[in-house]
Amino acid sequence: MAMSGRELVVYRERLGRFEEVGFVGTSEVALTFSYSDSYRRNDSAQSISHALPLGAGELPPSAVKSFFDGLLPEGSMRRVLSASFHTSEDDLHELISRLNDESAGALVFKVAGEDPAWGRGYEPMGDFDFERLAAFPREFAPHAAVRSRLSLAGAQMKVGLHFDAATGAWQYPKGAAPSSHIVKACDGGFSLQTINEAVCMATAVRLGFDAA
């Protein structure tokens, strides 16, 4: 089903290949989403959210907005990204199209006709990129997000990276290449935020829980 307004094709990666899931577009008043007919006929098809069921007809705009809004950064991270894209913080369609390799839900958003696997690979980090992230998180984290086109949900300044165990090198994921680590930086008035998280995770390990 074609959507009104600009259209993005939604893919999911399964068993080493990309499957077309549906379409994201815009109407005069809201973000829109529908599952593709081919995906509905797929025996392995699953809804991308309980709030967006496969068998439904027209999906409620409020549910569509809530789901896709939840895939995007929040707070100061979104403000900085929106400014760099010269768009509104509320323009979900534009933000998704710019940060189109969503990492949490295994979804990829591409313009119709664009290969979802195009540009997949890794780019080496600069020698001082970690120092820049720690010293200037507000400036560096959005820059890295634009560079890798990963959409990391939440309000913290964070960067999705890949560690190559064979070479010991840190890399930026490109295209739909997966990240192996999410690196966070302190932001604003919470200067010890990441230290607090590290202490909590270390405590969890000491108590017998599995934690990274």
Where are these predicted regions, by residue range?
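Phosphate/dinucleotide-binding and metal-coordinating scaffold of catalytic cores
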Residues: 1-212
